[in-house]
Amino acid sequence: LIEENIHRTGGINVEARVQDATVYDPDSEQAADIVIADVPCSGYGVIGKKPEIKYRATPQKQEEIVMLQRMILDKAAKYVKPDGTLIFSTCTIAREENEENVLWFLKNYPYRLESLDPYIPEELHCKSTKLGYLQLLPGIHKTDGFFIARFRRK
């Protein structure tokens, strides 16, 4: 699917890889201008389409997901060149997986948030998009729940 989308959109300098995102790849250190970390999540943002999610959720699973997300962010952060971009996204509305991960990441890595406004429709512009992140909510934004943050490496 990713390869199809790269071809469909005319991507010429895009490389999709199948690998374990929790395992460090030294050949990728500071090699990418942009890294997209679309991490595994609880899926609470798509619960309308997958109602079984609410029956499988537990506090322990939530903690495990957050730890997995942070392991992936740790590796992804190392692959971005100085002044490069890291995009972090989930399909959840859980604060622990979204805003709290952003705060954790900023505290532990040499990155800053960067405005999303130039990249999203004007009707989605708000205080948080100027800061560098956006939480889409079902019923408000006419979409599934989704979170995205844009980081710039210092």
What is the meaning of each model-derived region?
Residues 1-154:
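S-adenosylmethionine
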